[in-house]
């Protein structure tokens, strides 16, 4: 049966990203948020929110949900109003559309006929429906009706690592497979007005943005037709951290997605991440974490700061994660793929020798509900100028 499996590791062959056109400027967002939610009388809470926004290190975010949508659906701004139907009516349409835009960019970069796509993986925590966003995305793209689909709902911020793990397994165990994997999350599922009794809500309103990212994954790239690897997917792993239950979570209620984020998350991640690194890199003989490139989900500034401090990383190791956080906020599952895209583009622009900032080996980390950690060991490829 080995002849049915690919020879060699799977690689990322193309990357595409997409955001809604509507832009939220972080400096202006506290005034906007408290105005559109009719909460300007909550002056003390507004000042707390302004401080959260100021400390977020976010410059701007993209968001499909704009003021016109809120005028058409005024109940969305109420803190616990029964608005799930209205949110889902929007998101079951918009999530596949934004995902399709990212996929189209990845397919264009790949340069091959979309008829060669054999598998489609889609993840989103923003909506749930049957048939799912995978089906609608496939229809929008005009993929073959026989494309093999996998739909994963409610993974959250570690989903970017999950789609790479599953795409790798599919590509390596099905000779000739070309897997289109897409992540898309949108904040219309959790946007709501402020509450004095729920300060965690303010953090979510301050950091989350809308985005979609897609990759094409395959083994044995066919260079005769122009396929080129960007990163090899060497190994993958997933774990949930001890004593972390309830620190990150999301719960679908009549009022939409209710988000939990505990203040101990940065400490939990920073205290446990080296164990994940040792397990991943001991077989390769690497123990210097400054000798690898980093593609890290920027769940928030505090997470990056704590990990950098704990591992004694050089300040440039998270430059791509910090850039994506600044320009887009936390887009949940797609964010880490935005970071991957930023790293390979910056490596080319700065004349680095490899797609991984000049380093051969690297790691991708996603963090999310559980507290779950998803990691992928990557190998960069040389850049030929």
UniProtKB/Swiss-Prot annotation:
Pfam families cross-referenced by the UniProt entry = Chal_sti_synt_C (PF02797), Chal_sti_synt_N (PF00195)
Which InterPro entries does the UniProt record give? Chalcone/stilbene_synt_C, Chalcone/stilbene_synt_N, Chalcone/stilbene_synthase_AS, Polyketide_synthase_type-III, Thiolase-like
Gene3D superfamilies linked: 3.40.47.10
Q: Which family does it belong to?
A: Belongs to the thiolase-like superfamily. Chalcone/stilbene synthases family.
State what protein this is by name: Polyketide synthase 2
Entry's SUPFAM superfamilies?
Thiolase-like
Please give the CDD domains that the UniProt record associates with this protein: CHS_like (cd00831)
Q: Where in the cell is it found?
A: Cytoplasm
What are the GO cellular component annotations? cytoplasm
Q: Does the keyword Hydrolase apply?
A: no
Q: Does the keyword Thylakoid apply?
A: no
Keywords from UniProt, A to Z, are: Acyltransferase, Cytoplasm, Transferase
List the Gene Ontology MF annotations in alphabetical order: acyltransferase activity, transferring groups other than amino-acyl groups
Q: What's this protein's function? A: Polyketide synthase responsible for the biosynthesis of secondary metabolites.
Q: Which organism is it from?
A: Cannabis sativa (Hemp)
Q: Please name the catalytic residues of this protein.
A: 157
- Predominant localisation class: cytoplasm
Enzyme's top EC category: transferase
What is the tissue localization of expression for this protein?
Expressed in leaves and glandular trichomes.
Name the Enzyme Commission number(s) assigned to this protein: 2.3.1.-
**PANTHER family under this entry?**
CHALCONE SYNTHASE, HYDROXYMETHYLGLUTARYL-COA SYNTHASE
Tell me one GO biological process term.
Answer: polyketide biosynthetic process
């Amino acid at each position: 049966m080995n002849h049915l499996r690919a020879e060699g590791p799977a690689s990322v062959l193309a990357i595409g990203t997409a955001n809604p056109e509507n832009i939220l400027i972080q400096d202006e967002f506290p005034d906007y948020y408290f105005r559109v939610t009719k909460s300007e009388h909550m002056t003390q809470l507004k000042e707390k929110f302004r401080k959260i926004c100021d400390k977020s290190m976010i410059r701007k975010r993209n968001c499909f949900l704009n003021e016109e949508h809120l005028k058409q659906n005024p109940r969305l701004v109420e803190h616990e109003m029964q608005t799930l139907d209205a949110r889902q009516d929007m998101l079951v349409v918009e999530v596949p559309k934004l995902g399709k835009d990212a996929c189209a960019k990845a397919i264009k970069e790949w340069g091959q006929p979309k008829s060669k796509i054999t598998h489609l993986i889609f993840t989103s925590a923003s909506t749930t429906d049957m048939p799912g966003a995978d089906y609608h995305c496939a229809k929008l793209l005009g993929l073959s009706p026989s494309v093999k689909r996998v739909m994963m709902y409610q993974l959250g911020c570690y989903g970017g690592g999950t789609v790479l793990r599953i795409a790798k397994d599919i590509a390596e165990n099905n000779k000739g497979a070309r897997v289109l994997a897409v992540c898309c999350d949108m904040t219309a599922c959790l946007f709501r007005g402020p509450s004095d009794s729920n300060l965690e809500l303010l953090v979510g309103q301050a950091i989350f943005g809308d985005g979609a990212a897609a990759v094409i994954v395959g083994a044995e790239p066919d260079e005769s037709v122009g396929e080129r690897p960007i990163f090899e997917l060497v190994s993958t792993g997933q774990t949930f951290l001890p004593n972390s239950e309830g620190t990150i979570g999301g719960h679908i209620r009549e009022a939409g997605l209710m988000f939990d984020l505990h203040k101990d998350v940065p400490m939990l991640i920073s205290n446990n991440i080296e164990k994940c690194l040792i397990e991943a890199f001991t077989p390769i003989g690497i123990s210097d974490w400054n000798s690898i490139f980093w593609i890290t989900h920027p769940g928030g500034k505090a997470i990056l700061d704590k990990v950098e401090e704990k591992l004694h990383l050089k300040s440039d190791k998270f430059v791509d994660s910090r850039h994506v956080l600044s320009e887009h906020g936390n887009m949940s599952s797609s964010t880490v793929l935005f970071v991957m895209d930023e790293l390979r583009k910056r490596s080319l622009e700065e004349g680095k020798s490899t797609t991984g900032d000049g380093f051969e080996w690297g790691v991708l980390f996603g963090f999310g509900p559980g507290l779950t950690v998803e990691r992928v060991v990557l190998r960069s490829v040389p850049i030929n100028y």
